Amino acid sequence: QRMESWLHKQVAKDVANSQHSRKTTLELGAGTLNQLKYEPAFHPYDIVEPFTDLYKNSPLLERVRNIYSDCSAVPSGSRYDRITSVATLEHVCNLPEVVARSGLLLAENGVFRASIPSEGTLFWALGWKMTTGLEFRLKHGLDYGLLMKHEHVNTAREIEEVLEYFFEEVRCKVFGLTKSISLYRYYECRNPVVARCSEFSNEKNP
């Protein structure tokens, strides 16, 4: 839990200062709304989350302005200062479409902020096998790796390649020593390549 909090804190770092806490936000894959614990309580916050059971009983739901079941459902005229995701991009089957649409939904000087596990690296595999994987096998007698193969459809490298295709500026920070020797990564993306985003999402940017 303590290590996983790194994922949340990196994404929320830009609004830690009250001067920037009014930024409009769209969170992709908001799940149980646990990222809201790290976010200011009074800035406009929209979410994309297809599974209503994850958040419907959350006491944090009152802080959410708009809820969308899919990124494509967000009105094309909407603009956000920040679009965020925490341990979500590795699960997204249509990742290029989602990132392209996000690029079009960013306001001028907006930032796409995403934290992910270092999926696809030996260090990450060893990490979960010795913790969650071991616990899962002892409790259920099943191989957690099979579940991971179905859940994590994108590696960290694949995610980075998609981000670099749709954004001119992509910065990466790791929870570890290097990209290959890390448990988690945080990406900060600026200046979307609008032509590529529009072409891939079949949407013209107004």
Residue ranges and their predicted role:
Residues Q10-W124, Y186-P192:
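Conserved SAM-binding loop
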Residues R2-S5, S72, C93-A107, V111-F200:
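S-adenosyl-L-methionine-dependent methyltransferase catalytic module, highlighting the catalytic core
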